[in-house]
Amino acid sequence: MPESADPRDRLIVALDLPDVEAAERLVARIGDAVTFYKIGYRLAYAGGLDFAARLAKSGKKTFLDLKLHDIGNTVEEGVRSASALGATFLTVHAYPQTMRAAVRGRGSGLKILAVTVLTSYDDADAAEAGYALPVADLVARRAEQAAEIGIDGIVCSAAEAGAVRHRIGPSGLIVTPGIRPAGAEAGDQKRVMTPGQARAAGIDHVVVGRPITGADDPRAVAQRIVAEMEDA
């Protein structure tokens, strides 16, 4: 399992906020307690990509959670554009053609993460979408394909981390959303763990959103999560 020199890097705060101004306020409140931020669709479409570039220039790490999935050339060029923003991580859907294109476009500084199955999905959701395999088997199969193609890491729930690690080896990254501190509500995530449980399961980075962004003291919550992972 890859180790970061800075334990704060293990926590990625999801900036699922309505606009850049709200994101700027949150980042200022958290200060140096957090080094890594995730920007998804909501903020990306509201000026978040320029904000991501500014974060990167200020020394923060950024995770563009855009889940690219398109024809190969479009994905390849999109990945190159993300790399130019100074992003550290970028997500693509774990389809072989998409992953191969992303690897071609990533350059030297960007790491590509494959999204196997959304953590809001359970077996019933997978069946409804037409998949014959249960979620755990689907995640394992896609992780194996990603490793063969040369993807840097996998996004999966903590429940699947052991199976994923077996398939991607010790050097691959595992990034896990659906992380909730003890006592927090699960929200729309169906496969969740606490930060300490996730770290003990071999997770490299955990993604936490509402428990931090909605807290009265987001800096303190972030610090507790980092400490919990260090103690695991």
Curated annotation (Swiss-Prot):
* Cross-referenced PROSITE patterns: OMPDECASE (PS00156)
Spell out the GO cellular component terms annotated for this protein, sorted alphabetically and separated by semicolons: cytosol
Q: From the UniProt record, which GO molecular function terms apply?
A: orotidine-5'-phosphate decarboxylase activity
**What SMART domains does its record include?**
OMPdecase
The record's active-site residues are 67
**Cross-referenced Pfam families:** OMPdecase
Stored SUPFAM superfamilies: Ribulose-phoshate binding barrel
Mind listing the UniProt keywords for this protein, alphabetically?
Answer: Decarboxylase, Lyase, Pyrimidine biosynthesis
- Superkingdom field: Bacteria
Which purpose does this protein serve, as stated in its record? Catalyzes the decarboxylation of orotidine 5'-monophosphate (OMP) to uridine 5'-monophosphate (UMP).
Under which name does UniProt file this protein?
Orotidine 5'-phosphate decarboxylase
